[in-house]
Amino acid sequence: MDFYSLFLIAIALSLDAFGVALCIGLNNNVDLKYKSSCAIYFGFFQFLFAIIGGYAGFLFNKYIATMPQIVGGVVICIVGIIMIKEGIENEDSCKILKPGMNIILGISVSIDAMVVGFTALNKIQSGLLILRDTLFIGIVTLFVSILAFITSKYLKKIDVIGKYADYIGGIILIFFGLKMIFF
């Protein structure tokens, strides 16, 4: 696969992570350590799922093609609902910061990478080329997630966004999850 095609695939796959990272970054309770772990998990699971898909390829393509969007969409909708609930309750404890939630989010934004592995990367003849391409996808996702956290830092300074960040982030995640499920 040529670099341009691989780069476009990597950017497309990382947009889920960008949206989720942006919403997480808008939350005032999120610290740098958590943001870093989210970005690392997002990148790692993009790589992992893409490489699994690339190696499993044609064997499961027929049966799993629609499930990733549904599962990922449901998880992201649930996170959106949790964010809105926290905004309404105005709690200091934040459920999206609970241990393991960053792993769940990392998996949910990366399931589609497995489908890409099934369809686009399974034709690559060499295991090293699959490893190279999937590492590239993971690294692009890592940097796109970091970009989202940097962007959210500046968006929080806008009073309306900072005040209603949980609602805005929750609504965006719900719409994003519904889009993943139905479109």
UniProtKB/Swiss-Prot annotation:
UniProt main location, coarse: membrane
GO molecular-function terms, A-Z: manganese ion transmembrane transporter activity
Subcellular locations according to the entry: Cell membrane
Coiled coil: none
GO CC terms, sorted: plasma membrane
Bilayer topology annotation: Multi-pass membrane protein
InterPro entries: Mntp/YtaF, Put_MntP
Transmembrane regions: 6-26, 40-60, 64-84, 101-121, 135-155, 158-178
Keyword Transmembrane helix in annotation: yes
Entry keyword set: Cell membrane, Ion transport, Manganese, Membrane, Transmembrane, Transmembrane helix, Transport
Function recorded in the entry: Probably functions as a manganese efflux pump.
Family, as annotated: Belongs to the MntP (TC 9.B.29) family.
Name of the featured protein: Putative manganese efflux pump MntP
Organism: Clostridium tetani (strain Massachusetts / E88)
Gene name as annotated: mntP
